[in-house]
């Protein structure tokens, strides 16, 4: 017997029709904050398959052909048809929830990038006073440290951050399910305005250095983790250019304490005075 569950991320509801009873409760528990009663845009059929085991490591990853995306990992094999908004995934129960998370994360990434003109950033998103501050950098740059040094703030994610245009002159950051990253605090399943962005630089001093547009693009630009034949490099650059033209971006030198928030608050006040 199949059971249907609809979840919504970044304003996109999808239904998951899960075959059998064994994994219905853990899936509902994992995605409960993102449950939705809206009509789904995508329909995904999910089948446990005890015999599934990907032996050929060269087949692992994402491929795109004729409007269909195939996603293969150690314990899953799935596809998305972007022409009729349907998908199918088979998962070995030995790694069910984690494998489903891999597929769903990639699915929403594709939707955000291909349908919303959005971007997916390797960053930590911190919600403070109903506005989001995004801190970027490679592994080891201090993203998790920033989250730990912000105990009174809500951490939307410290790994994958969904950003998309909101109106004509602003951007919104959306919460995502817990896909193996650190999250903290209660938040609503909606977009929050993106206030500032920071590229992290560990230092004994604490200060902000504003980026110009060209330098900012070169510092924060990353190629999205999707098949490149679905999106041109020119289009990706255009999206970063638009984002950084609207959202202030800085190199943030910080020590292992919370003083960087004082520097951010001073910069906020300075920007408010200029705008006023």
Regions found by a protein language model. Name each.
Residues 146:
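Hydrophobic positions on the alpha1 helix immediately C-terminal to the Walker A/P-loop
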């Amino acid at each position: 017997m199949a059971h249907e569950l609809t979840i919504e991320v970044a304003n996109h509801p999808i239904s998951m029709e899960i075959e059998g009873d064994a994994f219905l409760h853990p899936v509902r528990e994992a995605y409960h904050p993102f449950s939705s009663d809206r009509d789904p845009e995508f329909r995904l059929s999910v089948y446990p398959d005890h015999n599934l085991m990907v032996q050929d490591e060269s087949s692992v990853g994402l491929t795109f052909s004729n409007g269909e995306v195939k996603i293969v990992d150690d314990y899953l094999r799935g596809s998305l048809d972007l022409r009729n908004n349907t998908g199918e995934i088979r998962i070995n129960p030995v790694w069910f929830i984690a494998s489903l998370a891999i597929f769903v994360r990639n699915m929403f990434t594709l939707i955000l990038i291909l349908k919303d003109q959005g971007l997916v950033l390797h960053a930590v998103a911190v919600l403070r006073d109903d506005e989001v501050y995004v801190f970027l950098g490679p592994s080891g740059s201090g993203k998790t440290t920033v989250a730990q040094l912000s105990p009174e703030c809500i951490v939307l994610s410290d790994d994958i951050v969904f950003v998309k245009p909101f109106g004509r002159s602003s951007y919104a950051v959306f919460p995502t399910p817990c896909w193996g990253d650190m999250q903290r605090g209660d938040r609503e399943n909606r977009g929050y305005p993106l206030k500032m962005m920071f590229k992290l630089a560990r230092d004994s001093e604490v200060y902000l250095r504003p980026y110009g547009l060209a330098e900012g693009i070169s510092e924060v630009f990353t190629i999205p983790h999707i098949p490149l034949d679905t999106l041109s490099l020119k289009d990706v650059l255009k999206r970063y250019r638009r984002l950084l033209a609207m959202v202030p971006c800085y190199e943030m030198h910080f020590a292992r304490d919370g003083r960087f928030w004082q520097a951010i608050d001073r910069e906020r006040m300075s920007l408010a005075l200029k705008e006023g």
